[in-house]
């Protein structure tokens, strides 16, 4: 897949970039130190990082802390955020184009990924259904217990007088002395 991403950023030669020293086989997305000026052939990722850093820099800049007009601060921050969003859209568009190329060149790979995603979604939903069934069984048992408790007192007559009558009926009659 690395070969299909060759030349993915503006100014980058086709093919995978050379690995940085000390990390064989891993491509580096950042080729310049953070905060350092970007080369003229910067990539979309470099520009995205730079605009992201600029968003934060505009928020913590000493110029803004030292009493700059609020409208000026708002305008500067809005411009930084808009630049970041524009570059993020360009980056997203690039990856969507690569995804489209991959789907044309290797449709079986896309189908495998879709099947894998669907399987994981089914497993997640099955687990959710089991969780709900467990809760349902619990509440059905609670309702059944409540119904059983309400049926037992219904067998007995209601009221204190009825209770006394029932209790006295079970007492044997006193024996007559002759």
From Swiss-Prot:
Supply one GO molecular-function term: actin binding
Region annotation (Disordered) maps to 1-43
- What assembly does the database describe for this protein? Forms a ternary complex with NF2/merlin and GRB2. Binds to actin. Component of the Mediator complex, which is probably composed of MED1, MED4, MED6, MED7, MED8, MED9, MED10, MED11, MED12, MED13, MED13L, MED14, MED15, MED16, MED17, MED18, MED19, MED20, MED21, MED22, MED23, MED24, MED25, MED26, MED27, MED29, MED30, MED31, CCNC, CDK8 and CDC2L6/CDK11. The MED12, MED13, CCNC and CDK8 subunits form a distinct module termed the CDK8 module. Mediator containing the CDK8 module is less active than Mediator lacking this module in supporting transcriptional activation.
GO CC list: core mediator complex; cortical actin cytoskeleton; cytoskeleton; mediator complex; membrane; nucleoplasm; nucleus
Q: Which residues form a coiled coil?
A: 109-145
Q: Which family does it belong to?
A: Belongs to the Mediator complex subunit 28 family.
UniProt KW Transcription regulation keyword: yes
Name the gene behind this protein.
Med28
Record lineage: Eukaryota, Metazoa, Chordata, Craniata, Vertebrata
Write down what this protein is called: Mediator of RNA polymerase II transcription subunit 28
- Domain of life, source organism: Eukaryota
Q: Where is the composition biased (Pro residues)?
A: 13-23
Keyword Nuclease set for record: no
List the keywords (alphabetical): Actin-binding, Activator, Coiled coil, Cytoplasm, Membrane, Nucleus, Transcription, Transcription regulation
Cellular localization per UniProt: Nucleus; Cytoplasm; Membrane
One of its GO biological process terms is: somatic stem cell population maintenance
Matches recorded under InterPro entries: Mediator_Med28 (IPR021640)
What species is given as this protein's source? Answer: Rattus norvegicus
Annotated function: May be part of a complex containing NF2/merlin that participates in cellular signaling to the actin cytoskeleton downstream of tyrosine kinase signaling pathways. Component of the Mediator complex, a coactivator involved in the regulated transcription of nearly all RNA polymerase II-dependent genes. Mediator functions as a bridge to convey information from gene-specific regulatory proteins to the basal RNA polymerase II transcription machinery.
Q: List the disulfide bonds.
A: none
């Amino acid at each position: 897949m690395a070969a299909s991403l060759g030349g993915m950023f503006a100014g980058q030669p086709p093919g995978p970039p050379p690995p940085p020293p000390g990390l064989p086989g891993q491509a580096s997305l950042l080729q310049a130190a953070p905060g350092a000026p970007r080369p003229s052939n910067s990539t979309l990722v470099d520009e995205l990082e730079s605009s992201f850093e600029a968003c934060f820099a505009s928020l913590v800049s000493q110029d803004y802390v030292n009493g700059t007009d609020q409208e000026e601060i708002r305008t500067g921050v809005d411009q930084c955020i808009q630049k970041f969003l524009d570059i993020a859209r360009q980056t997203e568009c690039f990856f969507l184009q690569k995804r489209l190329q991959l789907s044309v060149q290797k449709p079986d790979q896309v189908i495998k990924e879709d099947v894998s995603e669907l399987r994981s979604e089914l497993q997640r939903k099955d687990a959710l259904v089991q969780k709900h069934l467990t809760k349902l069984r619990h509440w059905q048992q609670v309702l059944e217990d409540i119904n059983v408790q309400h049926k037992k007192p219904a067998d007995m007559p209601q009221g204190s007088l009825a209770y006394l009558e029932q209790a006295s009926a079970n007492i044997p009659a006193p024996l007559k002395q002759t």
